Amino acid sequence: LGANEQHYEIVAGSPSIFTPVVTSNSAYMPSNASSSWISLPSGLSSATYQTTFDLTGFDVSSASLDLKIAVDNTMTDVLINGASTGFSIAIGYPAFQSWSNLTVSSKFLAGVNTLQFFAVNSGGPGAFRVEASGNAAAVSEPGAGVLFGLGLMGLAMTRKRKA
């Protein structure tokens, strides 16, 4: 607890930009091995949490990202590569006691992708938590089909010579 969080950075906030830290609060659902609550210094009213992931070598048209999100107090939007998902979590008790689910299946880029979470705190403690899982088909190596085809031709020619 209190250590700098390594997966997210704060790219916008009010009154200033801070590094998020791992936190806990007895009112929140407990952290686990998959995720922990991250927070900002007291008095911060809004923040944009950002993380990146790389889809190099994957077919982006097959990509899907499943997110479980919890927040104290409000999530106003989630962006994938600058495009809004239209996702939000209203202020209220359940927002930090249960998960809200979001599936993203478009707007992915070949290479590095950026996820941004817009969180608003209404005073007192504020925190954010996400668990992510995803799927994408691997892109075959360029020319792998040609090499495979040439290999089959070579196998067929070898069999003809032996016959």
Where are these regions (language model features)?
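Extended carbohydrate-recognition surfaces in non-catalytic/accessory domains of CAZymes
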Residues: 1-64, 117, 121
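Short, solvent-exposed coil/turn segments
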Residues: 46-48, 95-97, 140
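Short loop/turn positions at the edges of beta-strands in beta-sheet-rich folds
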Residues: 59, 71-72
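Beta-strand-rich ligand-recognition modules
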Residues: 70, 76-136
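A short, hydrophobic C-terminal helix/tail in secreted or cell-surface proteins
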Residues: 140-158
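Short, charged juxtamembrane terminal tails flanking transmembrane helices
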Residues: 161-163
